[in-house]
Each structure stands twice: as structure tokens, then as C-alpha cells.
A protein has these predicted regions:
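Gly/Pro- and small hydrophobic-enriched strand-loop and loop-to-helix capping segments
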Residues: 137-160, 164, 173, 199-214
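Amphipathic alpha-helical segments at domain termini/boundaries
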Residues: 1-29, 176-251
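Glycine- (often His-adjacent) and acidic-residue-rich active-site loop
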Residues: 37, 72-105, 125, 154-157
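Glycine-rich beta-to-alpha active-site loop
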Residues: 104, 110-155, 159, 187
């Protein structure tokens, strides 16, 4: 079994002559040591390691050692979701609850880190991989990415690490229903271009030097040179109607 590890590197951010800036960004890379034919997945062991890494980075943030944290993946893959082999080994309710709670606890640390967090989506981001990106403050995506989504419902599962609540808050209930229910039923996902149009990500960057551009973009956000505008969503009154329409289409 190939276990995804969480590798940490410190990146010194570029400064601007007019606004200063700089500082250290902790870059976390999800990597299982194999090529893209074996996508990185998130096993309970990976989630436990991620939790430990994030706790350590939170302590560094409190000490003023880092000004931001970013998560990315190995070439062509951000993260392809939970390790389904391990999920299939769940035998009782307590194990299922532990799996969900551990993922929630790890991802919640991103919101409680004390510094801005970034997801540099360099490749496939599905299920728990997309939920990891949603838990971050900001998201960049490579223009070559063609598979972003929450396909769990096609397997008889639900997004269990926050996607079902975080996604509609970001893109609205109609787009969220499409990503969570309609697209998986048709075996379709979201491309980088669609993700940018939906405001699922904040910026779509050239894949040729995606990581470098993402770091420069993050530095601009931290300096205040780049201001990310988020839509004000007021669609609570439409939730029931949208969900009912989706049920009708899928029945």
C-alpha cells in the first residue's frame, strides 16, 4: 500500500519595493512517492500526519515564524480523495464516525491556524482533496486541471469532510447541487476554467510555472496588493426548491 505523506518546505516570499511584505510560507506537499498513475489519496494515517503537521505549523504561526501556509500535491495530482480501500474496511458505526471526525478535526485546523492558508490546486482534486482546498482561505488552480469535484454520491457516499456545507457557501446552492449530485451522476467533473467562473477558486494560473505563480500571487494577497472579492450569496430561500428540482432530475 502506498501511503500519502505530508512534506513540509519553507518558502521565502518575494517582497515588493513599495509595500514590503515577504516572510516565510510553509508549503505542504501531499506525495505518495509514486507517479501520477497512482494518485495520492487521504488515508487515516495521512490525516493523522496532516493533523500533526498542522499543529506544528500553528505553533510556528503563533511564534511569528511563518506568515502563511499553503498545500499542494505531487505533479498532476492535488489529492484524489479518501483512500477508498481503507473506507471499505470500515465495519461499524464507531469506525465510520472516527473517520469523519478525524478529517473534520484536521481540516478545521486550517481555519484556526492564525495565518492565511492557500490551496495550490495543481492537479486532480476530488472528494476529500477538494474539501481540503475548500478549508483553506484562498485557492489557486492550474489551467491544465480537468477533474475537480465531489463524486462521492456516485459511490453511495456523501461528502464527509465539510464539502456539503463549505461548497454552497462559496458557489451557491444551485452550483453546489450540480457539483455534488448532478455531475457525478453523469460521470462529469469541473475543469479549472469552470472552477474559476463559479468562484470555486480565486484565480486560474498558467500551468507552465504554476507553483511559482501561485507563490507570487499568495505574496500579493498577503501584502494587500491583491484583494480577493467574494460574492455575497443570498440564496437560502431557494434551497428547498433547488434540492427538490435535483431530486426530480435524478429520479
Amino acid at each position: 500500500m502506498t501511503t500519502t505523506r505530508v512534506l513540509v518546505n519553507d518558502i521565502e516570499l518575494p517582497t515588493a519595493t513599495t509595500h514590503g511584505g515577504g516572510g516565510t510560507l510553509a508549503l505542504l506537499t501531499l506525495d505518495n512517492g509514486a507517479d501520477h498513475k497512482i494518485p495520492t489519496t487521504l488515508s487515516p494515517d495521512t490525516i493523522a500526519e496532516l493533523t500533526g503537521v498542522l499543529l506544528a505549523q500553528r505553533a510556528r504561526a503563533q511564534a511569528g515564524e511563518i506568515v502563511a501556509l499553503a498545500v499542494t500535491g505531487k505533479p498532476y495530482v492535488f489529492a484524489a480523495g479518501a483512500d477508498l480501500k481503507r473506507v471499505s474496511q470500515v465495519r461499524d458505526r464507531d469506525q465510520a464516525l472516527a473517520l469523519g471526525r478525524d478529517g473534520h478535526a484536521a481540516y478545521s485546523l486550517l481555519a484556526d491556524l492564525g495565518v492565511p492558508t492557500f490551496a495550490f490546486i495543481n492537479g486532480v482534486a476530488l472528494g476529500g482533496g477538494l474539501e481540503l482546498a475548500l478549508a483553506c482561505s484562498y485557492r489557486t488552480i492550474s489551467g491544465s486541471v480537468h477533474a475537480v469535484g465531489l463524486p462521492e454520491t456516485s459511490l453511495g457516499l456523501v461528502p464527509g469532510w465539510g464539502g456539503a456545507t463549505l461548497l454552497p457557501r462559496l458557489v451557491g446552492i444551485e452550483a453546489a447541487i450540480d457539483i455534488i449530485l448532478t455531475k457525478p451522476a453523469a460521470n462529469r467533473q469541473v475543469s479549472s476554467h469552470e472552477a474559476a467562473l463559479l468562484d470555486l477558486v480565486d484565480v486560474d494560473l498558467d500551468p507552465a510555472d504554476f507553483l511559482e505563480r501561485s507563490i507570487v500571487w499568495a505574496a500579493g494577497v498577503l501584502r494587500g496588493d491583491i484583494v480577493v472579492q467574494r460574492r455575497e450569496l443570498d440564496d437560502a430561500a431557494h434551497w428547498d426548491a433547488v434540492v427538490a428540482a435535483a431530486k426530480t432530475r435524478l429520479d
